[in-house]
Design a protein with these regions (language model features):
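Conserved phosphate-donor/acceptor-positioning beta-strand/loop module used by diverse small-molecule
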Residues: 109, 124-171
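Short beta-strand-centered segment that lines the nucleotide-binding/catalytic pocket of NTP-utilizing
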Residues: 1-10
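Short, surface-exposed, charge-dense and proline/glycine-enriched linear segments
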Residues: 27-38, 135-142, 171-173
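Noncatalytic linker/hinge segments flanking ATPase motor cores
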Residues: 38-47, 146-155, 176
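A solvent-exposed, charged loop/short amphipathic helix patch at secondary-structure junctions
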Residues: 60-73, 155-176
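Compositionally biased, low-complexity repeat tracts
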Residues: 3, 53, 138-140
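ATP-dependent small-molecule kinase phosphotransfer cores
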Residues: 10-120
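Switch/connector loops and helix/strand junctions flanking conserved nucleotide-binding motifs
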Residues: 8-9, 115-116, 145-151
């Protein structure tokens, strides 16, 4: 899972640091954290990407659980870079699965943000080239009902997503 790789390898420190910043606002926890008496870490798993989604946050009113748009944009850029890096790890994981586990087949769950970080029309796109050299790319085209089910699932349990900067700016302007 690319999202798991993003949340552990590439954004794990950002996530943990956000927890530590929150803990430092509580004197009791701050004292324990500064004396290395407690350890704060996310418990991200293949089935639970909530730490990553929670860190990415939602732009909006802080009193309602939102974060300032500038902070959201910063986190989106972190996520975009992490998405690219994790996708470029695919070849390494494919060869590793063969070498260590003797798996003849490797499935890369690229995640929903792949469309935001690649240009399939560009023959020199580094991510698309890497993926096409190491995998067979499969596009699963969903129906309108599938799209509706994904939207409903996203509302209940948001998946980590990165958005193209121009799209995000346009949607933010429409929102405010």
């Amino acid at each position: 899972s690319i999202d798991y790789r993003i949340g552990t390898r590439y954004m794990g420190e950002f996530i943990s640091d956000s927890y530590k910043l929150a803990a430092m606002k509580t004197p009791y926890l701050s004292e324990l954290l500064k004396s290395d008496s407690i350890y704060i870490e996310s418990n991200i798993t293949f089935d639970n990407l909530a730490p990553l989604s929670n860190y990415l946050g939602k732009p909006g009113n802080i009193e309602l659980g939102g974060i300032p748009i500038a902070e959201y944009e910063k986190r989106q850029e972190q996520h975009r870079k992490a998405e690219v890096a994790a996708l470029l790890d695919t070849g390494y994981f494919a060869s590793r699965s063969k070498e260590i586990y003797q798996y003849n087949n490797f499935i890369c769950d690229s995640g929903g943000s792949i469309c935001e970080v690649v240009n399939p029309e560009d023959p020199n796109d580094p991510v698309m080239n890497h993926l096409s050299e190491n995998t067979l790319l499969v596009w699963i085209k969903g129906s309108d009902a599938h799209t509706e089910a994904l939207i409903n699932r996203f509302d209940k349990n948001p998946k980590p997503m990165c958005y193209e900067e121009s799209f995000l700016a346009k949607k933010w302007e429409e929102f405010i």
